[in-house]
Amino acid sequence: MVIQRNSILLLIIIFASSISTCRSNVIDDNLFKQVYDNILEQEFAHDFQAYLSYLSKNIESNNNIDKVDKNGIKVINVLSFGAKGDGKTYDNIAFEQAWNEACSSRTPVQFVVPKNKNYLLKQITFSGPCRSSISVKIFGSLEASSKISDYKDRRLWIAFDSVQNLVVGGGGTINGNGQVWWPSSCKINKSLPCRDAPTALTFWNCKNLKVNNLKSKNAQQIHIKFESCTNVVASNLMINASAKSPNTDGVHVSNTQYIQISDTIIGTGDDCISIVSGSQNVQATNITCGPGHGISIGSLGSGNSEAYVSNVTVNEAKIIGAENGVRIKTWQGGSGQASNIKFLNVEMQDVKYPIIIDQNYCDRVEPCIQQFSAVQVKNVVYENIKGTSATKVAIKFDCSTNFPCEGIIMENINLVGESGKPSEATCKNVHFNNAEHVTPHCTSLEISEDEALLYNY
């Protein structure tokens, strides 16, 4: 009931903002945070952030065999269930038995993966619901099996399914051994059919989740995915793969509500962060991205599907040497809406397309046919974005003829070419609510006469 009452409050705030000024079309971040924190605190009758911090404390000796510590937390160590951690022996059975013990515990649990060891794992799923809260401490390294035949479900390697009140951290490394998979990608070898490769770490249907202080490298495909989750805090992540690795998104957010991603460094061969349909109330703060394809909303609307993303704020990002900076990408033929999106305080360095909306996205070998419908893009704010573009076109709005981009606000934008050379903006079917101090800017031929009056260069 608490969630329902607060959700109604949040909807009232959204509605009120939509009938106010142009700028208020996007929810005020401080107000959003107040409501978000209030939902968490009332739902669990305590300070949720303090609760997460308490569960995340490192135990002093992470090689101890199972015990109950002085705080009443049961410590379950995978070594006591037979894990070898030698990088040669599969440790799935030990991990599964340890998880079953942890998940059935009536008291809070620390699930410990000790340091200085390399645990070889086939495909594995840690399933809930569990009886109590669990903090998974990965101090060592988890290494994926390099045998493709070990993956009956090609969509995942490590997954947490329907686990509530979960913390995952410890500073260890998740190594997907993606080098085994990448050559078989249709993006590397265009003669091959396009097939899934596993996501290294998937959280599905998890509520009240914290993922903190982890390293992920060389994922088979996506590094970390949050799917159908609610109330997520992800921070202090280090994610890296080759710039030429296919589809290796850093953090992928799908159908997830109330998620905060912060203090994270990502360099991959695809989107640093990708936010797709069903996601709402997403905040990404202090993100370093590059190489990769930037921070993206989408893609949305593929296969003529309906897609919705709303209330997304990207604040304080540094994007270096990436294909794109901040991007919204939708396919022709889709429907739905991407709305109430903010890109604030972003520094670009040698980025091919620093600001881009692409409503004609086509990520396949064969050409995409022209279609009438499109996902509507509206109420997007770009504010305090500066830096250098690796190409002449620093701002690219390629919006739909039938469903143009609406309610676009740009303030304090300064993007130049290499060595300070002038850059350009290309703007098709875009309608502005305001544009102040924007370099480069759309030409008078690309926008209406009324919109031209909004510009204050």
Curated annotation (Swiss-Prot):
It is an enzyme of class 3 (hydrolase). Induction: By ethylene. Gene3D superfamilies: Single-stranded right-handed beta-helix, Pectin lyase-like (2.160.20.10). N-glycosylated. PG2B isozyme has a greater degree of glycosylation than PG2A. Optimum pH is 4.4-4.8 at 35 degrees Celsius. PG1 is resistant to acidic but not to alkaline conditions, at which PG2 is released from the beta subunit. Disulfide bonds: none annotated. It holds the Pfam family Glyco_hydro_28. Expressed only in ripening fruits (at protein level). Its EC number is 3.2.1.15. PbH1 repeats lie at residues 228-255, 256-277, 309-330, 338-359. Optimum temperature is 55-60 degrees Celsius at pH 4.4. PG1 is more thermostable than PG2. Glycans are attached at residues 189, 240, 286, 311. SUPFAM superfamilies: Pectin lyase-like. Residues 25-71, 445-457 form a propeptide. Keywords: Apoplast, Cell wall, Cell wall biogenesis/degradation, Fruit ripening, Genetically modified food, Glycoprotein, Glycosidase, Hydrolase, Repeat, Secreted, Signal. Belongs to the glycosyl hydrolase 28 family. Catalytic subunit of the polygalacturonase isozyme 1 and 2 (PG1 and PG2). Acts in concert with the pectinesterase, in the ripening process. Is involved in cell wall metabolism, specifically in polyuronide degradation. The depolymerization and solubilization of cell wall polyuronides mediated by PG2 during ripening seems to be limited by the beta subunit GP1, probably by recruiting PG2 to form PG1. Monomer PG2 (isoenzymes PG2A and PG2B). Also forms heterodimers called polygalacturonase 1 (PG1) with the beta subunit GP1. This is Polygalacturonase-2. The lineage of its organism: Eukaryota, Viridiplantae, Streptophyta, Embryophyta, Tracheophyta.
